[in-house]
Amino acid sequence: MSTAMNFGTKSFQPRPPDKGSFPLDHFGECKSFKEKFMRCLRDKNYENALCRNESKEYLMCRMQRQLMAPEPLEKLGFRDLMEGKPEAKDEC
């Protein structure tokens, strides 16, 4: 009985992402990285923790080609994969 009253109301309100935008890769600039990541996921039974290197490479490609806002890899959860190489920062 209570479900009949909910037909006219919207149950889902879309909202923008928390951080910036994630534009589509229309020109396929990072297609090879994406395919490598997706192949890894399929091969590893979709255990994304086993494909972190591929994920990092894909995100780095997107940042280098300005397909996403640049973020330090540490903030994206790749601190343990940084091999002791901090990102170069400009100091004025």
Swiss-Prot record:
Protein's cellular compartments:
Cytoplasm, Cytosol; Mitochondrion intermembrane space; Mitochondrion
Q: Any one cellular component term from GO for this entry? A: mitochondrion
Per its UniProt record, what PROSITE patterns does this chain match?
Answer: CHCH (PS51808)
| Bias (Polar residues) ranges | 1-12
CHCH domain ranges (all copies): 27-69
Keywords from UniProt, A to Z, are:
Acetylation, Cytoplasm, Disulfide bond, Mitochondrion
| InterPro entries per UniProt | CHCH, COX19, Cys_alpha_HP_mot_SF
Sequence motif: Cx9C motif 1, positions:
30-40
Keyword Acetylation on entry: yes
Annotated region (Disordered), positions in chain = 1-20
| S-S bridge residues | 30-61, 40-51
In terms of superkingdom, the source organism counts as Eukaryota
Q: Check the record and name the Pfam families matching this protein.
A: CHCH
Q: Which GO terms describe its biological process?
A: intracellular copper ion homeostasis
Segments carrying motif Cx9C motif 2: 51-61
* Known function: Required for the transduction of an SCO1-dependent redox signal from the mitochondrion to ATP7A to regulate cellular copper homeostasis. May be required for the assembly of mitochondrial cytochrome c oxidase.
Provide the family line.
Answer: Belongs to the COX19 family.
What protein name does the entry list?
A: Cytochrome c oxidase assembly protein COX19
Question: From which organism does this entry originate?
Answer: Mus musculus (Mouse)
